[in-house]
Amino acid sequence: MFSSCRYLLNRLPNSFSSGMINKNFNPLLYTNKSNAIFENRSPINILNVNNNKQYFNFEKPIEISENIDIKYYDNNTMDDISVGPSPFEIDPLVFSLKPSIINENIINEINIVEESELNENTYELLKRTYQPSVLVRKRRHGFLKRMSTVGGRRIIKERIARGRRLNSA
């Protein structure tokens, strides 16, 4: 499916700034003859021509049942004008699996500190996962919060039945 889309996009007129488009091909000569044979009608042009402008025909679906030769280009054979492949020729599934380009200069500038170079007075700080706050604790587990729900009132009743002096958190 993707290769047939790429084939059709390479056949469009030279409105894209890529060196990948076949410039020797006349898009008006291409017709879908296999579709015309099965449905007993005249061949359908892929492109419509109005006022010397070429438009893609989206009204009728195109079936391509013939073998299609796709010419693949690498970055070494591209002309100087285009920097990389056109967005129409990039397979998103393949390029999503590749890692992004890493600048080697940034990697060389990273200083790796040996353990022997550290001072004896330095120590590693760990982030505390519990940040205590009296207001938040009372808001979530306090007496008023317990009394606002049915389950909370049940907990208060159980704590009183056990003889607890402190009935909330």
Swiss-Prot record:
Give the record's keywords alphabetically.
Answer: Mitochondrion, Ribonucleoprotein, Ribosomal protein, Transit peptide
The principal localisation class reads: mitochondrion
Localization (cell): Mitochondrion
GO CC terms, sorted: mitochondrial large ribosomal subunit
GO terms classed as biological process: translation
Domain of life where this protein originates: Eukaryota
> Which positions are tagged coiled coil?
none
Gene Ontology MF terms: structural constituent of ribosome
Q: Which residues form the signal peptide?
A: none
Q: Which family is this protein grouped under?
A: Belongs to the bacterial ribosomal protein bL34 family.
The record's section on PANTHER family has: LARGE RIBOSOMAL SUBUNIT PROTEIN BL34M, MITOCHONDRIAL RIBOSOMAL PROTEIN 34 FAMILY MEMBER
Q: What is this protein called?
A: Large ribosomal subunit protein bL34m
Species of provenance: Dictyostelium discoideum (Social amoeba)
The top of its lineage is: Eukaryota, Amoebozoa, Evosea, Eumycetozoa, Dictyostelia
Q: Which gene encodes it?
A: mrpl34
